[in-house]
């Protein structure tokens, strides 16, 4: 019944995206146990970017400020679009790691911070265009990063 509601009113992809983010958090939990024992530096870059993306998901999506005028209530459609942006960043970062791009270049603090703050910086109405702009910004950043890496 709830799946039908999501399919009809939000997107058929919502539950798949939710499952992907749950898996990300589960893997992050396992990796954090290793990190506590031996430190993050011993992890390969694909696992380190997973930890970074879990931080983005936790801070940018799961943490809620009930006293904030925008964050106290977030429409389900906006939540879905927020998850899409986080997923876009995660997929782009994973592809960059596979191309052997340095983690310090992949983890652009300004871009990651902008994604974390989307729930505050994008209002709860008329948000489609802003999410499209942010997704384009992510795409453009990683495209440029990949092109620069290919030239080196």
Located regions from the model:
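Conserved catalytic/coupling modules of large nucleotide/cofactor-utilizing molecular machines
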Residues: 1-152
């Amino acid at each position: 019944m709830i799946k039908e509601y999501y399919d009809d009113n939000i997107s058929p992809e919502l539950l798949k995206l939710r499952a992907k983010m749950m898996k990300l958090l589960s893997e992050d939990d396992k990796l954090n146990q290793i990190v506590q024992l031996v430190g993050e530096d011993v992890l390969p870059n694909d696992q380190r970017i997973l930890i970074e993306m879990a931080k983005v998901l936790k801070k940018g999506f799961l943490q809620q400020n009930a006293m904030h005028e925008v964050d106290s209530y977030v429409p389900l459609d906006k939540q879905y679009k927020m998850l899409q942006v986080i997923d876009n960043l995660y997929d782009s970062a994973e592809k960059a790691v596979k191309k052997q791009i340095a983690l310090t270049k992949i983890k652009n603090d300004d871009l990651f911070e902008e994604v974390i703050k989307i729930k505050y910086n994008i209002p709860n109405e008329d948000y489609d265009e802003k999410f499209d702009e942010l997704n384009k910004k992510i795409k453009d950043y990683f495209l440029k990063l990949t092109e620069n890496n290919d030239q080196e």
